Amino acid sequence: MPDPAARRFSLPPFPLAALALSVALLGAPASLAQTAAPAPAPAQTPAAASRAAAPRVSWTKPLKVSSPVSIGPRGELTYVGNDSRVHRTDASGKELWSFALGDIGRAQPVLTPDGGVITAAYDDTVYALSPAGQLTWKAKLDGDVFASPALRPDGSVVVATAGGTVYALSSSGQTLWSYKVGAPVFSSPAVAADGTIYFGAQNGRLHALSPEGRLTWTYAARSSVFSSPALDAEGNLYFGSGDRSIYSLSPAGTLRWVQPTGLFVNASPIVTRAGLVVVGSYDGQLYALNTNGQVAWTYAAGAAIAAPAAELSDGSVVVGDLNGTLHAVTPTGQALWTLPGGAKIDTGAAVSDQGTLYFAVDGGNLNAVENLRPLATGPWPTFRASPLGWGRSATAAELTAQTQARQAAAAASTSQQPRLPTLAQAPAPTPAPAQTTPRPQPTPAQPATPAAPVPPVASPAPATARLTPQVIGGVIYLPLSPIAAGLGYQVQAGSPTRALLVAGSQRLTVPVRAVGGQSLIALRFVTGLPGVSVERQAGTLTLRREGLSAALPLDLAQLLPWAPQPEFPGVVRR
């Protein structure tokens, strides 16, 4: 969650006095000690862990972004700006329209199924806009709206205010019911599959309301709950607190476990496809916990984390810190890459189905990193569960639609995988520093059987080399020697994790992996080599460089077969 910046009251997410109190709290009380998870495993650090090549920032634009960014099905962006306007742009940041609000706002806009927008501002008002940016209705509430609204399946929205009231508004803006909390609410409501509404408040309690707005139960944490709850497939909920803890409650409100952290947890958790609860803390650590509360791994970002993380379809996780660095972490908690943002990052990264990642920094600049993976499909892979900002558990039909849309987008962008960063002239290889050695990926349950590699091409020729790809851990790999020879490179030296490609005066160090005595290179790295172009035809992907070419029999349906989505029966993913 971003820090609140309300104009009529100055309430930081955790006052300094409370911070001093939090630091003084050493450990959980006896009643919670038995539920605390084991001590974290040694944290992975950006300096110590293996890295892959960092992607390039495709563009940076001064778009005045203040809120989290919502992304529509076609890649269009919607956000609230620090100019007190709602903006919609295309995927490249070109403005399509804007609408003036009565004040600034930091709530994430909700994108309705018809392309409309529901958003809120610090003028105590919720606004509904048409797909063209025209006002449909607005509703005046009892306080500033910092928490992001939640969209229910019937089109109604649940909105919480700093005035301490939670409202349900109909699709036409009429108040269906309201519930008085008695304390400011900065935690964005989360709606479960059964319609139950969960949110935290500054009174230190996590509240559960029925779909009709009646209080079902509350759970008392030991400090304020600024963090927004995340839900897993079974309806269990996860949130952080100012008492330096991460909590899990059952749908009935009973404590499942609590995990202590070094400082307060204002960030909102996500739940990954593999069943990890991932959330950052002001202690500078990113925590990954199994849903039973055991620490799977921790990652040391080196700066406080207030933003929620996001999971990409390959299982990697991205998160920004308050020093302005965007971190990518492997599914096992190792550093993958980092990107400098230039200013603090306190909102989550937004990821389109087309594989473009957007992250905003303090001051309003928006950065785009293209040709990455799309968002993962799982119970709660990002803040508000969806790029649309719905803030609720998706139905089975919605999950199926999301999965198919992201698979189609991934298939369409196979030739546009992450590129290598700019590669300088490299000297003869020396023992690889940590940041250039990619972490070996998990062994897949059912890897495709590779065909025998084609013998290396003896000399550059216009003939097209034919290569057979294989899939490991959801990543398409090619035999290194044939693909290098087919594109005019010589493999002069290598190790199990890297290789030196030479073409004339050009010397490129690339990440590889050894499987069965053979060096393989990921397709996404090949397509990022300088001068390599890509052509796609039915069933074939052809790579070209300086008159040379290599053809790949790329049958995605065979390489990436549909598999049951374990969290959601009847849902498939590739």
Curated annotation (Swiss-Prot):
Signal peptide limits: 1-33
Gene3D superfamilies: YVTN repeat-like/Quinoprotein amine dehydrogenase (2.130.10.10)
Record keywords, A-Z: Signal
InterPro entries: Beta-ala_Activ/Resist, PQQ_b-propeller_rpt, PQQ_rpt_dom, Quinoprotein_ADH-like_sf, WD40/YVTN_repeat-like_dom_sf
The UniProt record lists the keyword Kinase: no
Disruption phenotype: Mutant is sensitive to gamma radiation and hypersensitive to desiccation. It shows delayed DNA double-strand break repair and delayed recovery of desiccated nucleoid.
Entry annotated with the keyword Iron: no
Stretches that traverse the bilayer: none
Compositionally biased tracts (Low complexity): 400-438
Taxonomic superkingdom: Bacteria
Ranges annotated as biased composition (Pro residues): 439-459
Chain residue ranges for the region called Disordered: 400-461
Physiological role: Plays an important role in resistance to desiccation and radiation, maybe by protecting genome integrity under extreme conditions.
Domain note: Contains an N-terminal PQQ binding domain and a C-terminal disorganized low-complexity (LC) hydrophilic region.
Name listed for the protein in its UniProt record: Desiccation/radiation resistance protein DR_1769
